[in-house]
């Protein structure tokens, strides 16, 4: 579900690459609080792409998809799946994230694998 922020509803979605239908990327958009059918901003560039080894080695190589997100203090944390085999997380400063999205800049998320199919845990 979208996250309520002071600037609007923050929504994450996944989409296929135009160049390669086997690759899934994650995008973000900000919707109006009172009228969520109105898109205020949409990230020009994907916010997550399958560029880590654990996002390209598994049941569905080249696939990342957000399964949840939460705002903790001034950080936004996205929980996502990598290659349908790994539980992953990515995070960024919320203010910087929103600023980058509004300015059509590339959004830099710090990411890492949390747990893989063998239940090995790795801190991000």
Q: Positions of the model-derived regions?
A:
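Carbohydrate-active catalytic/glycan-binding domains of CAZyme proteins
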Residues: 1-124
């Amino acid at each position: 579900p979208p996250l309520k922020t002071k600037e609007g509803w923050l929504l994450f979605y996944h989409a296929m690459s135009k160049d390669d239908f086997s690759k899934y990327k994650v995008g973000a958009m900000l919707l109006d609080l009172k009228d969520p059918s109105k898109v205020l901003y949409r990230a020009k560039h994907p916010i997550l792409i399958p560029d880590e080894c654990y996002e390209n080695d598994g049941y569905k190589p080249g696939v990342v998809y957000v399964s949840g997100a939460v705002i903790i203090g001034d950080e936004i944390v996205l929980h996502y799946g990598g290659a349908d085999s790994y539980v992953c997380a990515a995070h960024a400063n919320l203010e910087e994230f929103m600023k980058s999205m509004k300015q059509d800049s590339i959004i830099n998320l710090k990411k890492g694998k949390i747990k893989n199919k063998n239940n090995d845990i790795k801190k991000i």
